[in-house]
Amino acid sequence: MTSNITELNKWIEGYVNPQSEESVKTNAINMVLLYMKSNKIDLQDVVQGLGDYLKSNDSILRARGTLLLSEVLCRLPDLPLNQDQVHFLAMFYCDRLQDYACSSEVVKGITGLITNHTPDYPDNQKLLRNIFSEVHPTSLTQAHRKMVLQVIDIMFNKCLSEIQELKNDFMVGYLQFIDNEKDPRNLIFSFKLLPKVIYNIPEHKHFLESLFEIISCYFPISFNPKGNDPNSITKDDLSNSLLNCFSCTPLLAEHSIPFLIDKICSNLIETKIEALQTLVYCCDRYGGFAVQPFLEEIWSTLRTLILTHKNTTVIEESKKTIFYLTRSFTKERKVLESFLSIMIKECLHHIKSSQDSKIAIYCASILYQSVSASLLSSKIILIHIFPNLFNFLSELQKQDTVQKVNEQNSVIALFNDLLKANSIAFEMYSNENKEPNPLEPFVDQLFKLFSDLLLLNSSSSIRSNSIECLSNLYISKKVHTTEQDDDDSEQITNEFLLDLEKRQFIIKSLVSLLNSSDNTLRHKSLDSLFTIASNEDPSVLNLYVIPTLLQMINHSSCNINTTNNKINNNNNNNNIVIKNNKCQDEHCNEDHSNKNENNNNSNENSNGNSTSGSDDDLKHYLEAFTKLCTHQPLLESVIPQIQVLLQHNIKETYQSNEDFEKSILILQSISFILEKSTNIKSMTICSKSILFPLIKGLYKQELISSSNDNNNNNNNNSNRFNQILTPTLKMIHSIFENISIESQKPLLEKLIKLFLNGDTLVINYQLPTTTTTIIKPFEKSSPYKYLIPIFTTIISQSKLDLSENNELKQSLYQMSLDVNVDDSIAISCSKAYSSIINKQQQQQQQDQINFNFFNDNLLKVINDTTTPLPLKIRHLDLFTWCTKALLTNGNSINIKLGSCLADIISNENVELSYHASKSFGILLSETDVLNEKSGSIIKILFEQKFFTLMFPILLESFKVSKNKELQTISSHYLIAISNLLKHVPKEILLAELNEILPIVMQSLKSSDNNDQVQLLDSSLQTLTMLINETPSSFISYLDSLIPSLIKISTKSTKYNLKRSALEILTLLSKSIPFVNLFPYKTQVVTDIIPCLDDKKRIVRREAQKCRNSWYILQK
């Protein structure tokens, strides 16, 4: 024991002695702590050892001695101390606080004592009193000032009642310690502590003014943290903590609100914005009654900002402030009514007296924000505003309508804004209080007003605004309360404010405007119908809108056919085409007798314009039908009508070219509708009701075009079939892509029978007696090969594994290599074949698909010098798509196949080499097949993996061909590389920057002939991205880059290349330092002058921007 004491004294001497080295001090304190931890010495031993030092006349020795004791208390949280020892230490520190030289060390000791132990009453009070009375905050370092705050915080948690007994003394001492604090670490702690003080010390109300003076000096927070410290305190941290201080008690409202209003009037935009946001937060926390005395002052300030300020950000923030304040005041109705009464009175005054002015528009926006804030605010405002607006509009209508159109429009626009705002409020808050819609008392008056304006007013702008008002009134709902039968509880159901009759009137009025000569009215009507369709039950629209549109579409079609027949027959006997009052179109039952009587005399004069007019009508109706049917619930209900449209427009014969063009327009519209739908339910219905009739119609078309003996007619029919095929393939693609694998399976089984076995009964089609052969499109001599894309589209979108169907695979394989079919057919077969390969099971794929398969069947033919070029191209296309299939599903041979594709680029045949280089664009690009929607297997990051392994191979081949001076081959390798660069993420490009930049720079020197356009375009795109990401990397290339870009912008024959080059020059002027660009300034400004006279406006505009940017270059 004696030896331990001896060692202890030695360590105390080493620690306390100011002459000791830091290593000695560190070792000494560590050994003291170690011995105490192992119970070889105790606290009493340490105190006795420190006795002489604590009594020393040397302030440094006293401080070091005190620090040693404090370190022990802080660093040994589990140190066993009884209450006598705790009391002794508390009294020791109370006494030692009078020693100014030891204040920091004592504060640390008190922190350790309070944190790890609990002194008895009233030791905590004595410690805190002595800290407040003896310690001056300015004498402490940041860390020790924070310790004082931590001591207060701990005492609040451990002995709150003792702290509360201090009353005013605590508040005086606490304010002393937080005043004039500047360190952000202490500030954030004091800000977080303040609400706790407010909540727990009732005497704070006597010190509110002093308290607010202390915290308000920090607003707004201006603090920039160190950028290299991720754990540093941020400006937002300080701002949020200060915000909680401002709002911690309603008693601060009398100080904070005038202060914030003063800050809102600041000249600094940032200060205004932050003050507005703080005002909203504080008012919400204070409650309406605390804010009520300041309502007029708040409104006056916000009104001034909105009506007079020039900065849009400030104006929008002020509007948001009104919205949130109104929502907050909803909790106290009297306060809300007081606030809104001030606002309504002034807004109405400006609206009536300042019509067609910016002030009136801003007042309308203020009302919009207030109405949308809550259901109660909407009710209060609408009750006061609507009667005034009705009277005011009536007065305007009695005056000269021509001069007052703008004023009327402003009032109608305000009606519309209020309807929208009320809908927002009702949708957000109606279910909370089960209150009726505030519009309910005015609904009949509003309906009559807007209906009369639409039907009776001659102003297009007023009618347009009234259309939007009617649609917003239409979708406004009410809350209908009914009782449930089981437990008598109330059930809330939403119903429209307008009854069905009024809603049907609006629908009919809007439909009647769909063919208006006024584009604004037509588009506004269509948009309003779509808005209604998004809210209304589809059955209501199916009562009138859809049947009417379909009737109009068919009627427009009939007009086209009728007009053409009249033109054709007019020179013969001037017979009228309508017989028995029925249209000659076999699919139309329209009665045209009235039209015939009225228009018979005018046909001779109007024949030249009627066709184009009917064509425009048809486009307008189709536009409406298409937009409405993109709404999913409505689409499901109109699928039968779409089926009828398809049957009527994929006909065996067309009466004229105009009739055919009309059918194409309808098919394109249906195609657009189905493309926009991704709903499985809707597409499943389409697959059952539309798919097979659609294919049947296409079969009939192809049968007609293939069986016609007349060459001219045959070519015409073939062209028509191809035009029909384009939109119908998109329909088939959309349907099959969006149905489940369970729905696909039975359909595929039937379609394989149809296309491979010629079983047309699958589509319920009996071949004509004149057809002696079975329709098998995949037979070598079949004249029906144009049907193949239908089948390949389906196979490509199939989610099933079809790899076991060898007949299917062989048919696709052979057709993809057939040089006697169109390229589009062969490519579609290659896509379908690759899709099957992609979806094979991995083990089966390894067994059936290996490198030898491709080498023996495709590569040998491609590399054989005796093979005709068209056949090589076919094999190369199939090889490319198969490579893409195996690349996307992560097959291990994909890199080997890619290397073979790269080798083909070095082929002596220039056309084959160029085709191979373009193939690299297919490998990584997004296509309509081999994607996730089609059920393909897509491995994660396959693009990055392929680029990482393939780029070095292509780069090395490019260097070899360049060294051998094979200019054409090297340019083809550049095309392949550029195609890779175009489709990989920028992170990958940046990682290979040193290798990529020389390649891109080399590519810019290519000519813009047909073979090189793709290379230049891709290189310019890559260049733009790289300059945006790492502009400094191009400084060393400026001497070659800038002349190359100038040459492209002035000499290229492709306007898109010119524009891209000019955009890059502009980008360089903004991204590269002035000192590097200045030597080229004159060259750029002078040499791009020819672009200012370019025949393309887009080039001229970009040249002007580029020249201006370079002309004003400055340091």
UniProtKB/Swiss-Prot annotation:
GO biological process, one term: DNA repair
Function (record text): Key component of the cytosolic iron-sulfur protein assembly (CIA) complex, a multiprotein complex that mediates the incorporation of iron-sulfur cluster into apoproteins specifically involved in DNA metabolism and genomic integrity. In the CIA complex, MMS19 acts as an adapter between early-acting CIA components and a subset of cellular target iron-sulfur proteins.
Family per record: Belongs to the MET18/MMS19 family.
Record keywords: Cytoplasm, DNA damage, DNA repair, Nucleus, Repeat, Transcription
The name this protein goes by in its record: MMS19 nucleotide excision repair protein homolog
Low complexity bias spans: 596-613
Taxonomic superkingdom: Eukaryota
PANTHER family: DNA REPAIR/TRANSCRIPTION PROTEIN MET18/MMS19, MMS19 NUCLEOTIDE EXCISION REPAIR PROTEIN HOMOLOG
Subcellular location(s) per record: Nucleus; Cytoplasm
Database matches in SUPFAM superfamilies: ARM repeat
Subunit structure: Component of the CIA complex.
Gene Ontology CC annotations of this record: cytoplasm; cytosol; cytosolic [4Fe-4S] assembly targeting complex; nucleus
Region (Disordered): 587-615
